[in-house]
Amino acid sequence: MSQEFVEDYSRTGSSDDEDSGAYDEWIPSFCSRFGHEYFCQVPTEFIEDDFNMTSLSQEVPHYRKALDLILDLEAMSDEEEDEDDVVEEDEVDQEMQSNDGHDEGKRRNKSPVVNKSIIEHAAEQLYGLIHARFILTKPGLQAMAEKFDHKEFGTCPRYYCNGMQLLPCGLSDTVGKHTVRLYCPSCQDLYLPQSSRFLCLEGAFWGTSFPGVFLKHFKELEEYVERKSKESYELKVFGFRINDEAVSGPRMKWLRQYPSTEEDWEEFAKCEFETPAV
């Protein structure tokens, strides 16, 4: 019985050591959180490229620590520090007892310790800004296209759009301005997420350019949207259409108007890139 107990204890002890040595990677853990289904996983190769990180150090506080946390360098350094602390614990105690005044001077020169929750918040902000840049690249567009095909961003609530898939976007590229919006390629309108778990997501983590780049990259989607019938709802009372000049008549109807003649299409093409001459 004693030998069996020793064998069982050795097995459990080895399994505990393996579990303690393993840790979850930060990026997959962040993207798998509840309410983060709109995010895609950014490869570490993209983050390690200094060109892709240009000017982000000026926008995110504690940039270096946040970047190390995203790349899982923080977890590795913590494990090394724990091992060093166990080995050198006795030596540090002896030095502190012998050199109290010298240690006080060292403590004053050391940088203040930052709370881990602050670093975690900075890492989330940094990853969101990196994510906004990554989804404009070819691999990022492909990753977002898979989510688009699976309708992970939802469908347009407008009846005449016939369940068109939506695209996430932001009203500003600056953090803290607006939450995420959903763009419909069919009616070209913006909507709030229907689920409350997405209402607090930062819009800058997808940026203002993503829907336009997405539609230009996937030409078949743009052509499909152009082939769809452009119908708009008309108010009627007992089958009679309400006059546009009536008090209860339709407003801002021009927002859903589309070119119908060749002249209208030429004017539309000019307005897309320049102001037409009056």
From Swiss-Prot:
Source organism superkingdom: Eukaryota
Biased composition (Acidic residues): 78-94
Gene3D superfamilies: 2.20.25.20, protein kinase ck2 holoenzyme, chain C, domain 1 (1.10.1820.10)
Native source organism of the sequence: Saccharomyces cerevisiae (strain ATCC 204508 / S288c)
Subunit structure: Tetramer composed of an alpha subunit, an alpha' subunit, one beta subunit and one beta' subunit. Interacts with FACT subunits POB3 and SPT16. interacts with YTA7.
Chain positions found as Phosphoserine: 2
Acetylation listed as a keyword: yes
Summary of the function given for this chain in its UniProt record: Regulatory subunit of casein kinase II/CK2. As part of the kinase complex regulates the basal catalytic activity of the alpha subunit a constitutively active serine/threonine-protein kinase that phosphorylates a large number of substrates containing acidic residues C-terminal to the phosphorylated serine or threonine.
Entry's Gene Ontology cellular component terms: CURI complex; cytoplasm; nucleolus; nucleoplasm; protein kinase CK2 complex; small-subunit processome; UTP-C complex
Keywords in alphabetical order: Acetylation, Phosphoprotein
Other comment: Present with 8120 molecules/cell in log phase SD medium.
Keyword Acetylation on entry: yes
Protein name, per record: Casein kinase II subunit beta
A GO biological-process term: maturation of SSU-rRNA
MF (Gene Ontology): protein kinase regulator activity; protein serine/threonine kinase inhibitor activity
Post-translational modification note: Phosphorylated by alpha subunit.
Record-listed N-acetylserine modification sites: 2
Pfam family membership, one: CK_II_beta
Chain segments carrying region Disordered: 1-22, 78-111
Family: Belongs to the casein kinase 2 subunit beta family.
